[in-house]
Each structure stands twice: as C-alpha cells, then as structure tokens.
Amino acid sequence: MPLAKRIIPCLDVDKGRVVKGVQFVDIRDAGDPVEVAKKYNEQGADEITFLDITASHEARETTINTVEKIAAEVFIPLTVGGGIRTLDDIRNMLNAGADKVSINSAAVKDPDFVRIAAEKFGSQCIVVAIDAKRVSADGEPGRWEIFTHGGRNPTGIDAVEWAVRMTEYGAGEILLTSMDRDGTKDGFDLGVTRAISEAVRVPVIASGGVGNLQHLVDGVIKGGADAVLAASIFHFGEYTVPEAKAYMEQHGIEVRL
C-alpha cells in the first residue's frame, strides 16, 4: 500500500512573526507563529515546518521559546530549522518539542555534522534542507547548485549529488526548495524535484512556488515528491488544507483525510 502523501504548511519566521517573501526577499507579514500553527493543526495538516529565516544569516539562536509554545498547541510532527549548528542546538530543539530538525548551512560547512547528528539522534529526526537554483542554460540538461545562509551564498555544489551524499550520511528526509520558484506561485521546479526524488531513497519534500492546488498534484505526480510544502496559498486564505487534500485525492493521490 503506498504511503499517504503529506501536506506541510511552512512557517517562515522572522523576528517572531510568520512572513512570506518572493525569491527570499520582499517580505509580507502573515501573523503570529503560534496562532498560525494552531490553525493548521486544526485544519488537519500532516506536519508543520517552522523555519527561522533570519537565524543562519544573523547567526543567532532559533527562538526556542516560540517552538515550545507551538509544540504545546500542535499535535502533528513539527520540523524546526534555521540556525541549527551544533548537537546542542538539535538537543535543545527536540527538548523544546520539535520532532525533527532541518539542517542547511551547517551541513555544507561540515558534512560530518549530519552523520554525527544522525548517529546520535536517529535519521528519522534529521532533515537536510537544500536551497537549489538552476545554473544550466535553457535547453541544456538541468543542473542545479545549492545556496546557503537563506539563499545568499552560492556553494558551487551540485544539488542532486549533494542530496545523495547527505542521505548516505544519514539524513532521513530532504527538504528541497527551488530558489527560482520561491514565492512566485509558478509551481515547483519539477526538474530538480524529480532529479532528486529519483536519486535518493528517502522522502523528498517539494517546496518553493506553489500558487494553486494543481501545483501540489504536479509535485507528487510529475516531481515524484513524497510531501508538498506550501506557505502563501495557506497563510493568506486562498486555500485550506482540507481543500488541498480533497483536490489531491480527486487526482488519485492517497492522502490522510
């Protein structure tokens, strides 16, 4: 029996507020993180992802306090990312109520960190986040590079090769964001989503670019994703999680209703 595909609302948190930008800039306020998380919990989201989008860039600790408040109100898996640099950071997040942590910049700086973290805490709670940007010209075979620090720093690392390496190091899940599509509402970058989904044996979460419910379906059917993550379509009331699940089910995708 195929595993149900997951719908994951994403809370990008900046200075204690949920925000949403376009291609990592042009930020718009979307509310209080605890209230927003409660709303998605009540709507039947499968999981929630909380990304402190300023943490890595400004090199400060993720707001443990907010995570504790969300975890007290939300009874679905919670992934927390942003500024996770040490084993203590992971331990603190898990103790605050996170089920998984998402590691991005720190993995690139020290890939062994992922291996050690997976050995210590278990692969099931280590998510490696990849912010990928297409670097091949139109008409050429797809090639994507990973960027770190909230999409600010190019690395020269091939996104597909990196995803494979990170799963070999023990990542239990890949959270893949297309920087080209982030906030654009043009749909996922299905090329990189499929390339990584086919290359790794762990679940891939597609992120970046959802503008309508068909995009969620495409992420699963054309992109091969195991889960689809979206922010603005849910934050600003265009669609609810139940509407998204009903639409996916109508298109032959198994979801938890």
Curated annotation (Swiss-Prot):
One Gene Ontology MF term: lyase activity
Localization, UniProt: Cytoplasm
Gene Ontology biological process terms in this record: L-histidine biosynthetic process
Top-level taxon: Bacteria
Entry keywords, A to Z: Amino-acid biosynthesis, Cytoplasm, Histidine biosynthesis, Lyase
Purpose of the protein: IGPS catalyzes the conversion of PRFAR and glutamine to IGP, AICAR and glutamate. The HisF subunit catalyzes the cyclization activity that produces IGP and AICAR from PRFAR using the ammonia provided by the HisH subunit.
Family that this chain belongs to: Belongs to the HisA/HisF family.
Record's protein name: Imidazole glycerol phosphate synthase subunit HisF
Organism: Teredinibacter turnerae (strain ATCC 39867 / T7901)
Gene name tied to this protein: hisF
